[in-house]
Amino acid sequence: MFSRATRSLVMKTGGLRTQGTHSPGSAASSSQRRMTPYVDCYAQRSYPMPDEPYCTELSEEQRALKEKEKGSWAQLSQAEKVALYRLQFHETFAEMNHRSNEWKTVMGCVFFFIGFTALVIWWQRVYVFPKKVVTLTEERKAQQLQRLLDMKSNPIQGLSAHWDYEKKEWKK
């Protein structure tokens, strides 16, 4: 692995540096590589109170409000307190935990694809699959049963055992 001298050199310099692809020749600093927990402009429910504020670049009004924050909070109005909160966090807990209406879109897509599948199956039954075989009609099934009974097939335990040949009906 690393020798003791190499390890101490790495620790002193802050680690192995790699050159960025956007700025060849200069090493990327750790502050440039660090990403804030606010990804896609919203606080994550798993990490609701990040170390870094939401707004890092402040305007003149916001800087003045930050200076006023250092004084007594009793002198701040409700709107100023809300503005200070919005500088630190993007959303409140209520906004963060608010349910979205995304389930309606998901259910709509699910029902659309179920309906589309049903239409494809109906189309296949009407136009693709062959017609029913003639031997599956009720008339032909009755003729097949009568033929089995006339041949007296399996007279001990089969169909012929349950048929009364004298009365021409099923035994009760």
UniProtKB/Swiss-Prot annotation:
Disulfide bonds: none annotated. Residues 19-101 are mitochondrial matrix. Coiled coil: none annotated. Keywords: Membrane, Mitochondrion, Mitochondrion inner membrane, Transit peptide, Transmembrane, Transmembrane helix. This is Cytochrome c oxidase subunit 4 isoform 2, mitochondrial. The lineage of its organism: Eukaryota, Metazoa, Chordata, Craniata, Vertebrata. Signal peptide: none annotated. Residues 16-33 have a biased composition (Polar residues). It comes from Rattus norvegicus (Rat). The gene is Cox4i2. Pathway: Energy metabolism; oxidative phosphorylation. GO terms for biological process: cellular response to hypoxia; mitochondrial electron transport, cytochrome c to oxygen. It holds the Pfam family COX4. The chain crosses the membrane at residues 102-127. One of its GO terms (cellular component) is mitochondrial inner membrane. Residues 1-18 form a transit peptide. It comes from the Eukaryota. Highly expressed in lung. Component of the cytochrome c oxidase (complex IV, CIV), a multisubunit enzyme composed of 14 subunits. The complex is composed of a catalytic core of 3 subunits MT-CO1, MT-CO2 and MT-CO3, encoded in the mitochondrial DNA, and 11 supernumerary subunits COX4I, COX5A, COX5B, COX6A, COX6B, COX6C, COX7A, COX7B, COX7C, COX8 and NDUFA4, which are encoded in the nuclear genome. Residues 128-172 are mitochondrial intermembrane. Its main location: mitochondrion.
